[in-house]
């Protein structure tokens, strides 16, 4: 059944995910602000706030914030993406009210003490250095920065040492005032206490009479161009991303690409890239494909790493697989097998209640509801071999693909 959120008077949306099989509750606060909302000179701001929001509230010091959930064996965590920030708590259901109250305190009452937020810059700078030491992750940021050019989606989530140093406390407070408001947030939860009890707690702790509204994300024209670039890095093997612009988050064609991506390079060991390159030839330890959606576009990409001596042949094999999908329609058996596997993976993923809660918050933020699982299955079942072929030709055609290589210094 489709889940529609309750909306408080201040605009906060509340979303309850039913569950009854354990005594754990998961509560997430998803806020519609991310890297794309930053000024270029303050790149890294959203992630910086994700760190520093735990550094004190009007009634709690940092230690008390961290201990509030840890002391009862729970988990308090947060993450930042290009378009949203999320703070979430998983804890025994006896402490559900403690979790909701703490999220409210962080959202409404964070103080960002000068001393603490200056210190946290050094922590994030170390995180940046750690990231730079991980080429398999850094290459995605570089790829998006290059193909998005001046578009805000090309900004790095972590920012840089320079842009972090540019951020002052007043900049943080202005960013919070503009984006951290109830009408720009979703509180989602799963708890055995039930929806009525959760809604009462949400009203109690989040029902403040704040009626500010946030401007919707400005959509920017994306100047799409094809790039083929090498970046010199201190690497011991070749790292490559091959990719293209793809369908936006709410594009109806998205489902066919999700299915196609799963078939080509998804998490299954029987993906075509894994079987025909890693398993058949042993050329690479890691090869996969991914599809990331945003408000006005999406990015499809293939990543692999291999010895420099095997790079040319590996790339030939990748393009061979893409060419097959562009030229040859899937048989009915192949299509049904791909659907069966993907639906099975989705079914298993529902065992992870936290991910369902996080996904629900994001879905309500962008679509206004949570689609029922049966409707998701129907969307997948409707996909035809002709749609798969059309999608492959739109996204995978070699002359449309951009390439970024990390090569030796």
Predicted regions: what they are:
Residues 1-24:
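N- or domain-start disorder-to-order transition segments that initiate the globular core
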Residues 1-5, 217, 228:
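Short, acidic/polar N-cap/turn motifs at the starts of alpha helices
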Residues 7, 64-213, 220, 230, ...:
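Charge-rich, well-structured scaffold segments of protease-associated domains
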Residues 15-18, 176-177, 227-231:
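Short, surface-exposed beta-strand/loop micro-motifs that present aromatic residues
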Residues 18-69, 143, 252-264, 272-275:
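Active/ligand-binding-proximal structured segments within catalytic/core domains
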Residues 20-23, 81, 181, 235-236:
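Short strand-connecting beta-turns/loops that link adjacent beta-strands
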Residues 27-31, 103, 238-240:
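A short acidic-to-branched-hydrophobic micro-motif
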Residues 225-236, 240-243, 252:
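Phosphate/diphosphate-binding glycine-rich loops and adjacent basic-rich segments that engage nucleotide
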């Amino acid at each position: 059944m489709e889940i529609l959120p309750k909306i408080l008077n201040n605009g906060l949306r509340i979303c309850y995910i039913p569950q009854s099989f354990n005594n754990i509750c998961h509560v997430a606060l998803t806020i519609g602000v991310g890297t794309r909302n930053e000024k270029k000179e303050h790149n890294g701001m959203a992630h910086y706030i994700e760190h520093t929001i735990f550094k004190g509230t009007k009634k709690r010091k940092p230690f008390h914030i961290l201990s509030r959930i840890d002391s009862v064996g729970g988990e308090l965590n947060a993450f930042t993406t290009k378009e949203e920030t999320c703070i979430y708590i998983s804890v025994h259901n006896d402490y559900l009210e403690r979790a909701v109250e703490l999220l409210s305190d962080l959202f409404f009452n964070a103080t960002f003490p000068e001393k603490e937020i200056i210190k946290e810059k050094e922590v994030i700078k170390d995180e940046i250095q750690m990231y730079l030491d991980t080429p398999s992750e850094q290459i995605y940021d570089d790829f998006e920065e290059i193909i998005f050019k001046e578009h805000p989606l090309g900004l790095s989530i972590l920012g840089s040492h320079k842009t972090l140093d540019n951020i002052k406390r007043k900049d943080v407070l202005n960013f919070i005032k503009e984006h951290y408001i109830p009408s720009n947030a979703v509180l989602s939860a799963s708890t055995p206490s039930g929806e009525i009890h959760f809604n009462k707690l949400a009203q109690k702790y989040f029902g403040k009479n704040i009626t500010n509204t946030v401007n919707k994300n400005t959509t920017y024209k994306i100047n799409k161009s094809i790039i083929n670039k090498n970046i010199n890095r201190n690497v011991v093997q070749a790292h490559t991303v091959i990719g293209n612009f793809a369908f936006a988050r709410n594009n109806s064609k998205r489902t066919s690409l999700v299915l196609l991506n799963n078939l080509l390079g998804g998490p299954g060991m029987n993906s075509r890239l894994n079987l025909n390159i890693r398993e058949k030839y042993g050329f690479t330890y890691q090869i996969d494909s991914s599809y990331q959606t945003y408000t006005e576009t999406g990015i499809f990409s293939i990543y692999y790493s291999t010895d420099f001596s095997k790079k040319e042949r590996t790339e030939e094999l990748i393009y061979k697989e893409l060419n097959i999908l562009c030229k040859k329609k899937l048989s009915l058996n192949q299509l049904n097998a791909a659907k069966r596997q993907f639906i099975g993976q989705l079914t298993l993923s529902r065992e992870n209640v936290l991910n369902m809660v996080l996904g629900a918050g994001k879905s309500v933020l962008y679509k206004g509801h949570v689609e029922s699982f049966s409707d998701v299955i129907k969307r997948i079942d409707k996909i035809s071999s002709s749609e798969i072929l059309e999608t492959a030709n739109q996204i995978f055609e070699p002359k449309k693909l951009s390439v970024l290589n990390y090569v030796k210094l």
